[in-house]
């Protein structure tokens, strides 16, 4: 019997796949547990429509991510911080601080998990920071760490 998997099933397949399984396994286990549906023409049509909708959503998210990255790359983000005498920061500049600076400058909220810091920033200077957005969109933005009061 052909079934459409509604969830990932070990040793059978992943969600959305059409698989051929024994009638008993389908009727007594997969279908009653809500793991699969019989692959009727109506179910297949619904599955196809759902896949198309998911693809459209992915395209939309990718386009929005590309536009956001272009917007982010247009600006230089100056972040004022308190420092000691030698230009070292009290504490460290984190991805949350950078996300806040981006939000203030562009008006676009960006999640701190999208900002990748290899190591915390502990000194004044100009840095290129990697930004990883949804759908694999990555790029670099410029962040300048300046002493508070000397903008």
From Swiss-Prot:
* Alphabetical keyword list: Ribonucleoprotein, Ribosomal protein, RNA-binding, rRNA-binding
Q: Domain of life of the organism in this record?
A: Bacteria
> Pfam families, per this entry?
Ribosomal_L9_C, Ribosomal_L9_N
GO BP annotation list: translation
Quote the cellular component terms of the Gene Ontology held in the record.
Answer: ribonucleoprotein complex; ribosome
Among InterPro entries, the record links this protein to: Ribosomal_bL9 (IPR000244), Ribosomal_bL9/RNase_H1_N (IPR009027), Ribosomal_bL9_bac/chp (IPR020594), Ribosomal_bL9_C (IPR020069), Ribosomal_bL9_C_sf (IPR036791), Ribosomal_bL9_N (IPR020070), Ribosomal_bL9_N_sf (IPR036935)
In its UniProt record, a GO molecular function of this protein is: structural constituent of ribosome
NCBIfam families from the UniProt entry: L9
* Similarity remark: Belongs to the bacterial ribosomal protein bL9 family.
PANTHER family xrefs = 50S RIBOSOMAL PROTEIN L9 (PTHR21368)
As for what it does, the entry says: Binds to the 23S rRNA.
| Protein name in UniProt | Large ribosomal subunit protein bL9
Q: Which organism is it from?
A: Thermosipho africanus (strain TCF52B)
Name of the encoding gene: rplI
């Amino acid at each position: 019997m052909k079934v459409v998997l509604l969830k990932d099933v070990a040793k059978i397949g992943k969600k959305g796949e059409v698989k051929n399984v024994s009638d008993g396994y389908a009727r007594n286990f997969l279908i009653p547990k809500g793991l699969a549906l019989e692959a009727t023409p109506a179910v297949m049509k619904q599955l196809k429509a759902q896949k198309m909708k998911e693809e459209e959503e992915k395209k939309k998210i990718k386009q929005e991510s590309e536009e956001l990255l272009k917007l982010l790359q247009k600006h230089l983000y100056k972040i004022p911080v308190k420092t000691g005498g030698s230009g070292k920061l009290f504490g460290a500049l984190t991805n949350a601080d950078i996300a806040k600076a981006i939000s203030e400058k562009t008006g676009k909220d960006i999640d701190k998990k999208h900002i990748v810091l290899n190591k915390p920033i502990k000194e004044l200077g100009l840095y290129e920071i990697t930004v990883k957005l949804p759908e694999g969109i990555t790029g670099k933005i410029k962040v300048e760490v300046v002493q508070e009061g000397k903008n």
